[in-house]
Design a protein with these regions (language model features):
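Long, polar/Ser/Thr-enriched low-complexity segments
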Residues: 1-118
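Charged linear interaction tracts used for macromolecular binding and regulation
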Residues: 75-193
Length: 193
């Protein structure tokens, strides 16, 4: 039932009527629209997208602002975007979207020679993300894979502007990183200037 202080459609009507219309105030104007009840079927495709986007969004927790890493990343973040949205877009461009992106990110992180991604990721506050209705076998992106995604994004930014990230560990190719490089990377994400 809509709440009113005057005839319906005037002043401040709010609420729904007959499961068909919704009255509300938007930007100071009284508005009416059809009632839409969103569906959440939790399909496999939806799970894959939520898993990848959710994990990449969570990875932002590892970055302290300001930090040395953040300052360099902000330099190449496109105007009108946050560094997080630029990172998500870039990582999807690197690994792919949906189930393809999840599988590629997990494979890249698992195939990396440094073995301390998980330990370091836990140390910077990252946690695994699991979505049970995503593609079977690819229902989790670990904290270490989230940290690896930021590292891959970093090297992509460095390729576009070599003057950025001109320090260790970024002078070593990501594929050649060892445990000390991963630890140094996490420190760069967290070091306040």
């Amino acid at each position: 039932m809509a709440k009113v202080v005057a005839p319906l459609g005037s002043f401040s009507a709010s609420g729904k009527i007959g499961k068909s219309l919704v009255f509300f105030s938007h930007l100071g104007r009284n508005v009416v629209r059809g009632l839409v009840t969103p569906a959440n079927p939790q399909t496999v495709g939806q799970g894959d997208s939520r898993l990848l986007l959710g994990a990449l969004g969570r990875s932002a927790r590892a970055v302290v602002t300001p930090s040395d890493w953040f300052n360099d990343a902000s330099t190449v973040t496109p105007s009108g975007q946050t560094w997080v949205s630029a990172m998500i877009t870039n990582v999807i461009n690197i690994f792919g979207k949906g189930a393809t992106g999840v599988a590629a990110l997990n494979a890249a992180a698992d195939g990396q020679s440094a073995t301390n991604w998980e330990t370091v990721a836990d140390g910077v506050g990252l946690t695994d993300l699991t979505i049970t209705y995503a593609t079977t076998g690819e229902q989790t992106i670990t904290a270490g894979a989230q940290l690896y995604a930021i590292a891959a994004h970093t090297f992509n930014m460095k390729a576009s502007n070599p003057a950025l990230f001109d320090r260790s560990p970024y002078t070593t190719a990501l594929s050649a990183w060892d445990a000390a490089d991963v630890t140094e990377f996490a420190t760069d994400l967290q070091t306040v200037v």
